[in-house]
UniProtKB/Swiss-Prot annotation:
HAMAP family, sorted: UPF0291 (MF_01103)
Species of the source: Exiguobacterium sp. (strain ATCC BAA-1283 / AT1b)
Signal sequence annotation: none
Transmembrane segments: none
Basic and acidic residues composition-biased segments: 63-77
Principal subcellular localization: cytoplasm
Compartment(s) where it occurs, according to its Swiss-Prot or TrEMBL record: Cytoplasm
Protein name (database record): UPF0291 protein EAT1b_0405
Any Pfam family matching the protein: DUF896
Record keyword Cytoplasm present: yes
Renumbered residue ranges of the record's region Disordered: 53-77
Keywords for the protein's UniProt record, in alphabetical order: Cytoplasm
Any one GO cellular component localisation term in the record: cytoplasm
Length: 77
């Protein structure tokens, strides 16, 4: 999870890069913040996928077997 203010800082640095450019320290900070953001995003997305169930219009569970296997591993079954 991103700490409060990190997304705002990412956006600030992105806007500054477009308008006036960034110092080397700011470029490094921007890269680190982006990596943290991507890590949090991927973790959140994976968590959502591991809780997903696909159902057809008739109410039958049609979740792909690969996803079911991954969900079992994720839950430790």
């Amino acid at each position: 999870m991103l700490a409060p203010g990190q997304l705002e800082r990412i956006n600030f640095l992105a806007n500054k890069a477009k308008t006036e450019g960034l110092s080397q320290d700011e470029m490094n900070e921007q890269q680190n913040l982006r990596q943290e953001y991507l890590k949090a995003f991927r973790q959140s997305f994976k968590s959502q996928m591991m809780g997903m169930k696909v159902v057809d219009p008739d109410g039958n569970d049609v979740t792909p077997e690969k996803l079911k296997e991954d969900q079992k591993r994720y839950r430790g079954e």
